[in-house]
């Protein structure tokens, strides 16, 4: 059965019977979006949350048979049939971008698609297709359960078959697609086939400033769950007016896989749901059970003085959801944080404090694997960011791998979560930009919904972003309204091209504005906070006037920082013909004549291999959360200003060092530094400085 989203039909755009060239078809038989979680059969396994240890989980990552063709009219049409011989095909690993595995070629364009522009159609002469096939085994103990097939991200559109039967279709390269394959799978050996289109109508909403890659680029796996199961849940932590106590809300939605007709309420009567909260010391601070009367349950508990989550203090609690139904017990465990993000008095507040956004834009990029980024690389990025006083990341310009958000929760990093929507190459005129074309509205809402539903429970997500460089119009009005209608936490919404007077942004978030524009906003139009979505373009010898920006930002309350463009060079490892290593960019890896934006992808604060570049040291200095000023060099009086919002400086050890001509002349400690957040104090060092021309270093 074909279940497809529909949009407004006009004669403005050419039509096609191909699903991948039809904005009326966003997905076929895809399951509804939900938060990221896994249910386990024991509490112990749920706490560890290692999917690979579940007997009801099976990874499909690894080696698949693969065939690549440069044109869609050359794709195999019967390879998905059960028993069809693909032994003569090549091999490819999953997840991977096929260009990084030797099939086709990658190219980099900052905007403009790199293909003939004729939405929603794709010119057949440049329409690569990859066909994948492999086998998998369904264990006997999965019998009687619902079997779900999960794709974390496929660029840019794909079909899937199981045992020769067509299961479904989906698009959107950066959010998950799940399918119920219970009717198609059998106990024992099964065959799965996937056909991926590099370019599709969805690609017209993915014109981001990055390498153009394709393929199954995030995890693929199967999991089995009882017929009655938790379909989704939403956590809301509503802080009181003093930001001290909180109302903890948990909304749980159950489903019954035997309810094949989605028009009726699933039969779950008699199921029991229990929730508990445990603090970092292992103390249970709340537990409650409810018996389901229908498929939706609401838990509410007033929590006194919980430890709040922020980028400075990423306090987390462990939430356990237990479902008992039909003699089976399922456990779901995840971290939650008590955090409130809101706009008040033209300021962005986190837990009541007007925090500064000391941010960067970050593409998912690996110099050896393209858009496939592993956990070690994510952790390395977060460690480097924390070491250099960066407290916020804009996921430019699409939802990142789900593990990134879990790590941001743990490490403490604010996230501006951005929908996978950019149509830069269509221009910005109202009659051209896709943001103002009603025919594309369903696609805009679909991508926004899938981001929100997946990421809604992460405390790190303090702002939703509707997209990037797509223009302005009715479709962003619709997605703005959709988020505010569905996000019970009511986080602010950020729309890059909306301007400060448009009704579909809560934050004025321009890019690359000069300092006088910031001053004018602060003086004459401070109706909402200004947070630069991109600034301090870090290409080459740059970031020179960052301190000038921050002198102004710290002067006016409605100015609250921004996100530097960008974090990491998008270079790819390559060698010359004589074996010398270099970082490839633009069209280096493509045939002559391929569209290219040259080295415009090389504008990070760090190199592609995560080596620090010189200007990140300037960022560290400007973004630092303490300021020192020598008041009296004879008496050794030092003024110390605490720029943190939630941290007392008694969390730190202070040492001082007197240097002259590069030599350390004296050094010591400054004890008993007790300075609350946003306060200034004066401290006496242990030496009288007779020569003010010699620098003093305090760390």
For the regions a language model picked out, list residue spans one by one.
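Short edge beta-strand/loop segments characteristic of extracellular beta-sandwich folds
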Residues: 137, 249-257, 637-645
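A short beta-turn/strand-edge loop motif at beta-sheet boundaries
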Residues: 256-271, 645-652
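Accessory beta-strand-rich segments of carbohydrate-active enzymes
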Residues: 11-14, 21, 27, 50, ...
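Core domains of carbohydrate- and sulfate-ester-processing enzymes
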Residues: 17, 61-129, 194-228, 346, ...
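Single conserved hydrophobic/aromatic residue that forms the stacking wall/gate
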Residues: 687-698
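Structural beta-strand segments of beta-rich domains
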Residues: 145-147, 246-250, 634-638
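Intrinsically disordered, low-complexity Pro/Gly/Ser/Thr-rich segments with frequent PxxP/GP/PP motifs
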Residues: 287-305, 662-686
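Extended substrate-binding grooves/exosites of carbohydrate-active enzymes
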Residues: 5-50, 101, 115, 165, ...
